[in-house]
């Protein structure tokens, strides 16, 4: 009996798909296109269910410091050694999804957004080590991790986290925001 490759139904995590041997349509050429047509901000618009979330996960896996480069073995992008040497695993990455911010009120949306910020900030605990950040920076970071955020802190939370990561790593930060339109759609729906 022939062995079948598993289909990744409902799986939007690039690392899981590659590690667990799921069928994967190689879209790593998008990384090359992105880098060859670099912009300060890049917006990817496609209809629902066109793989945007999986592509965001792929971008994170490619760019993030400490990435497992074996995830890309045998894929299109691995043939471009110069590009991989220059960019793979070289950047701090903030990756959030606003899919869960589907609240029916401002207060509930704020609470959900705060949770997303807290979870992402926790992913970067390494910045508390060493002396690259001063005590004020570390206190700002801890306010993001603990959720001890006033309105202004929450509004500027991504900018703050980006600045702290940039200071710690001395590199530009890649920020990936998936489902960015969900809070806007819910706000429009609920007035």
Question: Residue spans of the language-model regions?
Answer:
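Walker A/P-loop-proximal flanking segment of P-loop NTPase domains
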Residues: 1-80
């Amino acid at each position: 009996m022939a062995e079948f490759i598993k289909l990744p139904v409902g799986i939007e995590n690039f690392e899981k798909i590659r590690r667990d041997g799921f069928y994967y349509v190689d879209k790593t050429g998008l990384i090359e296109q992105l880098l060859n047509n670099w912009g300060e901000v890049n917006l990817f618009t496609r209809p629902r269910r066109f793989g945007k979330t999986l592509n965001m996960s792929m971008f994170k896996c490619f760019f993030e410091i400490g990435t497992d480069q074996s995830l890309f073995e045998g894929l299109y992008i691995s043939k471009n050694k110069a590009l991989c040497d220059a960019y793979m695993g070289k950047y701090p990455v903030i990756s959030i999804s606003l899919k869960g911010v589907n609240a029916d009120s401002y207060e509930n949306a704020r609470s959900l957004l705060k949770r997303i910020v807290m979870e992402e900030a926790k992913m970067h605990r390494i910045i508390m080590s060493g002396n690259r950040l001063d005590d004020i920076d570390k206190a700002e970071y801890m306010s993001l991790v603990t959720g001890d955020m006033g309105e202004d802190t929450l509004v500027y939370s991504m900018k703050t986290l980006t600045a702290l990561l940039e200071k710690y790593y001395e590199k530009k930060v890649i920020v990936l925001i998936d489902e960015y339109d969900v809070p806007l759609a819910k706000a429009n729906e609920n007035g």
